[in-house]
A protein has these predicted regions:
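N-proximal low-complexity "stem/linker" segments adjacent to membrane-targeting elements
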Residues: 1-44
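Conserved donor nucleotide-binding strand/loop of the catalytic core
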Residues: 73-88, 166, 170, 189
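Active-site nucleotide-sugar/metal-binding loop of Leloir-type enzymes
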Residues: 93-105
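Short, acidic, metal-binding catalytic loop of nucleotide-sugar glycosyltransferases
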Residues: 44-53
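A conserved acidic beta->alpha catalytic loop
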Residues: 58-74
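Short beta-strand/loop segment that forms part of the nucleotide-sugar
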Residues: 52-60, 81-84
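Catalytic-site signature of metal-activated, phosphate-bearing donor transferases
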Residues: 2-11, 15, 117-309
């Protein structure tokens, strides 16, 4: 295979990208494990904002996820891959390798992340202004528990409305406990996000953004180079954003810490005390930007009726 800086590699990538029609305009790739309680909401929402296919990687789930995703499987909207051994990044790169000619754009998300445009536009319509980039980096908004010890009887998008606002994100100087084993993040963790990539131009994908590309820049929504987690990172999410329901309830956060990292199974178990300290950062402001968008989608999809079955 040509190297990432090879002119031939870039030429091949650009040649592939000359294709003008794709089976899917915007797909999402995600790896999951025992997420059955959340899958229907997540799938419903993303279908509603313009996602027309899902590449899902099942990490040895033991719950009833197959029943939950059955309606989307029946409509041909999900490509399901069993992925019980390899970690998250390997799944992402498998997706690029196998499906680069199937989707114009692929967004890499977790099941607690919800991509949308605050303008109310469909995301594929927004993406038309970013043709030529290898990846569009979308900053996230981090949501806390809102004081909920357990999950309320409501969709995630309705239940959690307290977050770290833009001013707090830009000023974040919380010491996330950098250590040699990388078991905790470093300062600037809130100034992060995920990427929507042109899979023909990306050579290798990491969790948050491409590790290497064949051609094309990696830019944010304002067409600026990405300064991920940097002190002077120009965080902006007025065009596209990701609501990251990082903790959900305190009970769910505790379980998340106990499960460990899906991205790196060799990473030592995280510190619950430090993660609870992080969570306390994320409840200072109320943000309901997504609520009207979600309610419109839920009504159109008859989500409440489907949820009660």
């Amino acid at each position: 295979m040509p190297s990432p800086i090879s002119p031939l590699g870039g030429w091949i990538a650009r040649w592939r990208d000359r294709q003008t029609e794709f089976p899917h305009e915007l797909a999402v790739c995600a790896i999951f494990k025992n997420e059955a309680p959340y899958l229907a909401e997540w799938l419903t929402f993303h279908e509603g904002i313009g996602v027309d296919h899902f590449y899902l990687y099942n990490d040895a789930s033991e719950d009833n996820f197959s029943e939950v995703i059955a309606p989307w499987m029946a409509r041909g909207m999900i490509t399901l891959t069993d992925w019980p051994v390899h970690p998250q990044v390997a799944a992402y790169n498998d997706c690029i390798r196998r499906f680069r000619m199937q989707a114009r754009w692929i967004a890499f998300l977790d099941l607690d992340e919800f991509l949308f445009s605050p303008t109310g536009q469909q995301v594929p319509d927004v993406l038309t202004r970013y043709r030529g980039v290898s990846a569009l980096f979308v900053y996230w908004v981090l949501f806390g528990s809102g004081g909920n010890e357990v999950q309320p009887d409501a969709p995630v998008l309705e239940a959690y409305r307290r977050c770290l606002d833009l001013e707090g994100t830009r000023a974040d100087a919380f010491d996330h406990g950098k250590s040699d084993d990388r078991s905790n993040y470093v300062t600037g963790w809130s100034r992060d996000g995920k990427s929507i990539v042109n899979p023909r131009l990306v050579r290798k994908q990491n969790v948050h953004k491409p590790k290497s590309v064949w051609a094309g820049p990696i830019l944010d929504e304002n067409r600026r180079p990405v300064r991920q987690r940097a002190v002077d990172s120009p965080v902006s999410y007025s065009i596209l954003r990701i609501n990251h329901y990082w903790s959900k309830s305190i009970t769910e956060l505790t379980a998340k810490v106990e499960r460990g990292s899906i991205a790196n199974r060799k990473r030592p178990k995280r510190s619950l005390e430090r993660w609870l300290a992080r969570e306390r950062m994320l409840n200072g402001s109320v943000d309901e930007t997504v609520i009207p968008i979600w309610r419109r989608i839920a009504a159109q999809a008859d989500y409440d009726q489907a949820r009660s079955k």
